[in-house]
Amino acid sequence: MKVLLHLPALLASLTLLQTAASASDDPTAETDIIHDTVEEVKVWVNKAFLDSRDRLKMAMTTKIHSTRHLSDYLKHAKGRTRTAIRSGQVWEESLKKLSQFLTNVTGQGLDLTLLSWEAGCDPPAPTMTCNISSPYRTITGYCNNRKNPALGSANRALARWLPAEYEDGLSLPYGWTPGKMRNGFPLPQPREVSNQIAAYLNEEDVLDQKRSMLFMQWGQIVDHDMDFAPETEMGSDTYTKAQCDEHCIQGDNCFPIMFPPGDPKLKTQGKCMPFFRAGFVCPTPPYKSLAREQINALTSFLDASLVYSPEPSLANRLRNLSSPLGLMAVNEEVSDNGRPFPPFVKMKPSPCEVINATAGVPCFLAGDSRASEQILLATSHTLFIREHNRLATELSRLNPHWDRETLYQEARKIMGAFIQITTFRDYLPILLGDEMQKWIPPYQGYNESVDPRISNVFTFALRFGHLEIPSTVYRLDENYQPWGSESELPLHTVFFNTWRLVKDGGIDPLVRGLLAKNAKLMHQNKMMTGELRNKLFQPNHTIHGFDLASINIQRSRDHGQPGYNSWRAFCGLSQPKTLEELSAVMKNEVLAKKLMDLYGTPSNIDIWLGAVAEPLVHRGRVGPLLTCLLGQQFQRIRDGDRFWWENPGVFTEKQRESLQKMSFSRLVCDNTGIDKVPLNPFQANAYPHGFVDCSSIDKLDLSPWASVKE
């Protein structure tokens, strides 16, 4: 079906200059103009993407490195994700060019369906046939919903629970145009907000007396299993990333974070922190909105995709296809006291080698490109591949007639259930506290009318976890005492730090630290440690770090996020308008005044900051707004997942009973040299109180998976 857009309406939204030129009445004229324009745009968009990849490779081989290079490595789009983002870039740039010189090409409007086809956007029709009888998820998440196979699959737009809010109604973020008002007030610079609200002078952390480091780390695991929005490239044939990196020149997809007067970073890092906008996808029929929509490169489901990847080609590379046992590939060069590490990435040199050239240990290859971002995350990935291989090996003993594919898929299915169970049984109740039942009622079965897509706002709600990260990572010995001469590692030294795992102790000392050390408490007066607020991706003294709080604020504007009060209204909460009302919501007059001085109105407070600033709910670790946003999202990914572990038919009744015995403590017992673990690993634990021998921890009984060969 031909979908048309009346151009005057578009131009009002784009605020672009329009010439008086008009095309011929020839019905082929529009087709030719669209084709020629898209082909022209493709040339320089493709060049920008190629240049970016080459520049990243070159950056890793030079002796002068920057925080930007390390960030680029994490946020660099690959495979199908890269293709989807490139098509979105071509679509948007082509639309801008067409709107500059066309008035009414055919007398009816611009054919957006044709434009989408020329730009390489996904066709509306399904691109694959779904095997509705398959007991296994697809790698991409496609076919989960039988009526709408693409729902929740990888490389689609994040869902909008509220309409996007951009300066121009289309793509420009608020804060882009100097002096531009929002709700009658100018927006403050993100770094200024960070300096005044997120910082604290005394760097001593306020530790959470009831939550372990594992509680913090599990939040990142869940996040990396459900959402990832890589950055896009420059949108212009004349503007380069170098201009953004080196000269802080705002333009196209460069949106630098400027340092305010008096900021200490002005002396060491110049005028700004470089910031590139998130990748986005083409609009989809029926084109009711042309506002920029950011991509989710992952499946929306809690399915262990961080272990297995949502990208089919990578998923295959992560497997040991030479083994008949359905195993994941492991590192053939190094091991951890005989236990496997993940394979190394092939990129030479990788950022992990760059930050410690002497050690020369590459980053790990995993289902998620961020696996080596920090040492505790790399430790978690190591545990997961070990557990997969343990499960696959045990299943092969039970079912020697099963082929490699069945063993792989069954182990993968169990791993997905483990992450689901651990998240909903152990993590969410102590995160959402007394509010959990309000937002996540007991499971009633799969509902195909529930939209499981990750919402755009959820990608900011989950960033509350940044305020739970302490300034130190601990390594402990078998008696849970300090391990070696460097038992306490400053947080900024563990980014891209695989060499510590491979050459300095393995994962066991770090796992003990996860179990026996405390998370940081999310505190209104001590929000974010300076290790993240000033030293993000600063692995050594030669590289100056980023500010994660500023990035979160700038990213929310990049995504066109509505402000604090809009989300309070969405959740049925009060919308403060005055200092007194905001003070009552925050239960903190000093904080409320700082926010009002910066933003002018509570309506303008950036969603991430407003949400994390709220006082915690009873027995939880987030405030009322976050319990709403997090609770609704987790309810949707559970009820809208056809392969949810509790959905009848996914597992047998006996298998479900057995799966409930799985626990993180058992995962540790089965895949490390640790023999004493806490009964409640997500709660704060002080050894030996609450610790038991591994023989006291329930094991997963795999006998319900035994089958008789037909």
Swiss-Prot record:
Cellular component aspect of the GO annotation: basolateral plasma membrane; cytoplasm; extracellular space
Entry binding sites for heme b: D223, E373, H466
Propeptide, chain numbering: 24-80
Annotated keywords: Antimicrobial, Calcium, Cytoplasm, Disulfide bond, Heme, Iron, Metal-binding, Nitration, Oxidoreductase, Peroxidase, Phosphoprotein, Secreted, Signal
Disruption phenotype: Knockout mice exhibit inflammation and lesions in the cardiovascular, respiratory, digestive or excretory systems, neuropathology, and tumors, with high incidence.
Active-site residues from the entry: H224 (proton acceptor)
Molecular function as annotated in GO: heme binding; lactoperoxidase activity; metal ion binding; peroxidase activity; thiocyanate peroxidase activity
Family under the similarity heading: Belongs to the peroxidase family.
Protein name in the entry: Lactoperoxidase
Species whose genome carries this gene: Mus musculus (Mouse)
